[in-house]
């Protein structure tokens, strides 16, 4: 089963799905959905359309340079079937996918770290600017305690006068 790539969004196209457009010069364009086909007909650049993989890679939002991508390249060299080789290949594919997932997660976390640091700096700046809006948690407690003590003293004095 051959899984093709969409020309516009680089998404996977499974057999029996999508649409194929063949130009007069025999160049084949495959599209996964009508949305991609319409955008292609409107001559939109996939690197400028924000939801495409091309945009995400160009903007640095996804991992682009990594050795694990070398395994996905198409090889048109026929190989004689051997059960051992087949099993080793499947194990290697699982391992490569595992490594790729880890690297992508690490890349995303590193990308988000910068934003977290900027957010911290902005929060500190905002607190410094609006410090007058923040009340100290024990600011009103002193007055309340003082009022309670005055009230108790008053009650004690009243009790002594009554007796």
From Swiss-Prot:
GO biological process: ribosome biogenesis
Pfam families cross-referenced by the UniProt entry: Ribosomal_L24e
The keyword Nucleus belongs to this UniProt entry's keyword annotation: yes
Protein's cellular compartments: Nucleus, Nucleolus
Domain of life: Eukaryota
InterPro entries: L24e/L24_sf, Ribosomal_eL24, Ribosomal_eL24-rel_arc, Ribosomal_eL24-rel_N, Ribosomal_eL24_CS, TRASH_dom
GO cellular component: nucleolus; nucleoplasm
GO MF terms held by the record: structural constituent of ribosome
Protein family membership: Belongs to the eukaryotic ribosomal protein eL24 family.
Function in brief: Involved in the biogenesis of the 60S ribosomal subunit. Ensures the docking of GTPBP4/NOG1 to pre-60S particles.
Subunit structure: Associated with nucleolar and cytoplasmic pre-60S particles. At the end of biogenesis it dissociates from cytoplasmic pre-60S particles and is likely to be exchanged for its ribosomal homolog, RPL24.
Name of the protein: Probable ribosome biogenesis protein RLP24
Species this chain originates from: Mus musculus
Lineage summary: Eukaryota, Metazoa, Chordata, Craniata, Vertebrata
């Amino acid at each position: 089963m051959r899984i093709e790539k969409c020309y516009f969004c680089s998404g996977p196209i499974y057999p029996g799905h999508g649409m194929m457009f063949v130009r007069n010069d025999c160049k084949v364009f495959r599209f996964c959905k009508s949305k991609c086909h319409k955008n292609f007909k409107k001559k939109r650049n996939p690197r400028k359309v924000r939801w495409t993989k091309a945009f995400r890679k160009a903007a640095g939002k996804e991992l682009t340079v990594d050795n694990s991508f070398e395994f996905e390249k198409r090889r048109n060299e026929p190989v004689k079937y051997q059960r051992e080789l087949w099993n080793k290949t499947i194990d290697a594919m699982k391992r490569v996918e595992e490594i790729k997932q880890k690297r992508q997660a690490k890349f995303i976390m590193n990308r988000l770290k910068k934003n977290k640091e900027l957010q911290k700096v902005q929060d500190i700046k905002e607190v410094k600017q609006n410090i007058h809006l923040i009340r100290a948690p024990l600011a009103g407690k002193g007055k309340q305690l003082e009022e309670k003590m005055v009230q108790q003293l008053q009650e004690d004095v009243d009790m002594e006068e009554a007796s």
